[in-house]
Regions:
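Non-ligating segments of multi-cofactor redox enzymes
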Residues: 1-402
Length: 402
């Protein structure tokens, strides 16, 4: 067992392999305040990657309604229950996770694990996790649009001074996080799961897979899925053919709400403020990882929903939720201090090309590709035009004048 540093939890932790970060790390930010659960992302992924035999139950991209929706069923409740108490300690303005990660919860002496001639017991079953039942994959829309909170009566209203709504839900779009310390890679007894050095995408070598399903057990996010027809595990491939061409993945390109930004994510000490993902995660600190306490250092980040109580969101995104929500709201209000963030939020989802650098001027936000070529321009303020109610040239009244 190696000791690796996980910056998301502020400490070193146990992991089956030594720390070895790739040259670049595939990363993403989702603004879930804008997600409408249209499932266009889900269908674009499904029709591209998982329309074969044995893949009927697979959704490498899915959108679930929180707090009650989940695919597979109760994936998050299952792993959180198994981890026990998950407390954070604040230390000089930074947060340190004091609970166990999935690699530490079973208190295994990894140096005395089973020998190489007994591969099934080498890693997977020592990582805290579970294999979902086949029925757990059968209800991808379970809990859709079901709210939590108070029951609305005829006189229920939302006052201006309420920070969150008395009744709430939100949509959580999910893909593979292509984690820095991937549970699926740590759990595979035959090392069929690997991380690409050139972009950090986590893939399964299906020719090497021996169907132990330990990657399924070891992925707490439920994103490694077994194909019973092919007798192999399969997962999101990060749309690597598109990424290699400088394009964003299918689910990003087809997102109607423009909630997704794809790019490269660096560790905090190597952050580049002109890099959109680095800026949202490290500079503005408005985008947060999903269940960082699990210990995988996931590389998909979320701007938390402003209408949801902090207690629920802290469990999901960590202790910086309140600050992230405040910063996001200030940017959306137009506070001058957050003009750069506001410009980047406008730029999200505006091009099929990967934006590697961005700039914000008084008039517009501009995105550049890896060659420094402009691939997107969006105005900071949308122009508005008001037409006369009566059109004298056509001798007609207009029904829509804005």
């Amino acid at each position: 067992m190696a000791e690796v540093y996980n910056w998301q939890i502020g400490r070193e932790m146990d992991y089956p392999y030594a720390e070895a970060r790739p040259e670049k790390q595939w990363g993403a930010v989702f603004d879930i305040n804008k997600c409408i659960a249209c499932q266009t992302c889900t269908l674009s992924c499904k029709t591209t990657w998982t329309h074969g035999e044995g893949q009927e139950h697979m959704f490498w991209n899915n959108v679930e309604t929180k707090p009650y929706g989940s695919h597979p069923i109760e994936w998050d409740k299952e792993i959180l229950d198994r981890l026990g108490v998950q407390e954070w300690r604040e230390e000089d303005g930074e947060y340190v996770y004091e609970g166990d990660t999935i690699f530490e919860a079973n208190d295994v002496d990894w140096d005395e694990m089973a020998p190489d001639d007994d591969p099934q017991n080498r890693h997977g079953q020592d990582i805290e996790g579970y294999i979902p039942d086949s029925e757990d994959w059968a209800h991808p829309n379970l809990g859709e649009d079901e709210p939590a909170g108070e029951t609305f009566e005829s006189d229920t209203h939302i006052s201006e001074d309420e920070e969150t709504h008395p009744m709430w839900f939100f949509y959580l779009p999910r893909v593979c996080n292509h984690c820095s310390f991937a549970g699926c890679a740590g759990g595979c007894p035959v090392q069929a799961v690997y991380k690409r050095q050139e972009d950090g995408i986590v893939l399964i070598d299906e020719d090497s897979c021996e169907a132990f399903q330990e990657c399924v057990r070891a992925c707490p996010y439920g994103k490694s899925v077994y194909n019973p027809e092919e007798s192999v595990s399969q997962k999101c491939v990060g749309c690597y053919p598109k990424v290699e061409e400088g394009l964003v993945p299918q689910c990003f390109e087809n997102c109607l709400g423009k909630i997704r930004q794809h790019g490269w994510i660096n560790p905090p000490d190597e952050a580049d403020s002109s890099n959109p993902i680095d800026y949202l995660v490290h500079d503005a600190e408005v985008a947060l990882p999903l269940y960082p306490q699990l210990g995988l250092e996931p590389n998909v980040y979320y701007i938390p929903p402003i209408n949801v109580p902090d207690d629920y969101l802290i469990q999901m995104f960590g202790p910086r939720v309140a600050d992230a929500k405040e910063t996001y709201q200030a940017a959306r209000r137009g506070d001058e201090e957050y003009r750069k963030l506001r410009g980047l939020l406008h730029l999200m989802g505006s091009t099929e090309w990967r934006v590697e650098e961005f700039d914000v001027t008084d008039e517009e936000a501009i995105g550049y590709d890896e060659d420094g070529e402009t691939v997107a321009r969006v105005p900071m303020e949308e122009p508005q035009y008001e037409r006369e109610r009566f059109d004298e040239d056509n001798n007609a009244y207009r029904l829509d004048i804005t």
